């Protein structure tokens, strides 16, 4: 299941409550073609990796989070463990997304 983040406090709450679990963040926008293309795959990964927390942040709705996380383009995927960023890449690369999750588990 993918959780939609609506506020900076909700974002921080997910990072804090994840504990030792990996958190994968999809920074996207409704107008972004590649974001729409990879979204079903991101949701499928959330079913496959049920020990990983998957969240989506709309950069237009949550500009403060996008700015704080230094998101420059969409989609950007960031990976957090124990509240710390442990990985990041940009672009709708399905293979890289799944490989990065496997690597960080």
From Swiss-Prot:
The active site is at residues 32, 35. The modification N6-acetyllysine is found at residues 3, 39, 94. One of its GO terms (cellular component) is cytoplasm. GO terms for molecular function: protein-disulfide reductase activity. The record marks 26 as: Deprotonates C-terminal active site Cys. The modification S-nitrosocysteine is found at residues 62, 69, 73. It is found in: Nucleus; Cytoplasm; Secreted. In the fully reduced protein, both Cys-69 and Cys-73 are nitrosylated in response to nitric oxide (NO). When two disulfide bonds are present in the protein, only Cys-73 is nitrosylated. Cys-73 can serve as donor for nitrosylation of target proteins. This is Thioredoxin. The record marks 33-34 as: Contributes to redox potential value. The modification N6-succinyllysine is found at residues 8, 94. Homodimer; disulfide-linked. Interacts with TXNIP through the redox-active site. Interacts with MAP3K5 and CASP3. Interacts with APEX1; the interaction stimulates the FOS/JUN AP-1 DNA-binding activity in a redox-dependent manner. Keywords: Acetylation, Activator, Cytoplasm, Disulfide bond, Electron transport, Nucleus, Redox-active center, S-nitrosylation, Secreted, Transcription, Transcription regulation, Transport. InterPro entries: Thioredoxin, Thioredoxin-like_sf, Thioredoxin_CS, Thioredoxin_domain. It holds the Pfam family Thioredoxin. Participates in various redox reactions through the reversible oxidation of its active center dithiol to a disulfide and catalyzes dithiol-disulfide exchange reactions. Plays a role in the reversible S-nitrosylation of cysteine residues in target proteins, and thereby contributes to the response to intracellular nitric oxide. Nitrosylates the active site Cys of CASP3 in response to nitric oxide (NO), and thereby inhibits caspase-3 activity. One of its GO terms (biological process) is response to radiation. It comes from Oryctolagus cuniculus (Rabbit).
